[in-house]
């Protein structure tokens, strides 16, 4: 029997991309190289393409996963997150890092998404989110899955790191869940060499993510009333150095967006 080989990925960075980056770096004065206007421009363009109101660029898809679950921990102190065994390790590790309990649900072989009969049996009062992975460009959504989330008041998180542009009922996946994550790793459908983005229609969740992207600093929040509420609750602290909770630097280098 002949061996069949289908490459999973190839480097999609070409000479034109490299030259564009060189020209950007050769500007005078030297452009801002981290979290500048190009990042905001990209976030807005991505939101228009996907159909989500709030979009936050980070330095990798893995960081998008970790930051999403860290922000979820601001909404719920503990609980369980259901996820498939067929996923990338960062989905699982992000749940563990934020001290949620990962609960694994087997997949079906039709779309490599959850076996919904098994999923229903795993839902408990402690279930905080269902973390879906769209595998290799295959849509993992069904009406039944969306109804399960709605009926049980459970957040749906979509991992779309390897399924950019996949659709379900005429809408792009990543626009259905409470929040979705994309990766722009060098071998994915669209690349910034390294990078990722968090997408949601929930402003409070977005503002939490904004703070946590930069060590947890609330001065990164753009919603003044949310920021002032935290400042007023901490009158003894310098308002420029109030941190929502322990976090990391998830910011993206602007060079990746050229």
Please provide the spans of the model-predicted regions:
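N-terminal "arm"/small-domain region of PLP-dependent enzymes with the aminotransferase-like
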Residues: 1-32, 244
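PLP-dependent aminotransferase-like
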Residues: 73-160, 167
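Active-site region of PLP-dependent enzymes
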Residues: 163-169, 176-258
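Phosphate-binding glycine-rich loop
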Residues: 32-33, 37-80, 94-96, 104-106, ...
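Conserved SAM-binding loop
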Residues: 57, 83, 198
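Structured loop/turn residues at beta-strand edges in well-structured enzyme cores
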Residues: 50, 76, 125, 174-175, ...
């Amino acid at each position: 029997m002949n061996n069949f080989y289908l490459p999973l990925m190839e480097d999609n960075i070409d000479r034109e991309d490299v030259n564009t980056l060189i020209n950007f770096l050769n500007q005078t004065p030297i452009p801002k190289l981290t979290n500048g206007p190009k990042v905001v421009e990209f976030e807005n363009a991505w939101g228009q393409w996907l159909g989500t109101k709030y979009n936050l660029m980070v330095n990798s898809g893995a960081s998008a996963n970790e930051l999403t679950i860290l922000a979820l921990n601001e909404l719920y102190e503990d609980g369980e997150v259901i996820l498939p065994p067929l996923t990338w390790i960062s989905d699982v590790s992000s749940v563990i890092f934020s001290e949620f309990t990962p609960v694994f649900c087997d997949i079906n072989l039709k779309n490599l998404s959850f076996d919904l009969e098994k999923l229903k049996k795993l839902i408990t009062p402690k279930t905080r989110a269902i973390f879906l992975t769209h595998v290799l460009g295959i849509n993992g959504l069904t009406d039944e899955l969306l109804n399960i989330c709605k009926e049980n008041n459970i957040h749906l998180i979509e991992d779309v790191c390897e399924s950019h542009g996949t659709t379900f009922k005429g809408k792009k996946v990543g626009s259905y869940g409470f929040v979705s994550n994309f990766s722009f790793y060098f071998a994915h459908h669209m690349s910034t060499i390294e990078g990722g983005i968090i997408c949601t229609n929930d402003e409070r969740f977005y503002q939490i993510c904004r703070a946590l992207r930069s060590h947890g600093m609330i001065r990164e929040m753009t919603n003044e009333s949310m920021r002032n509420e935290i400042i007023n609750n901490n009158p003894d602290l310098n308002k420029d150095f109030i941190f929502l909770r322990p976090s990391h630097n998830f910011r993206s280098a602007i060079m990746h967006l050229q």
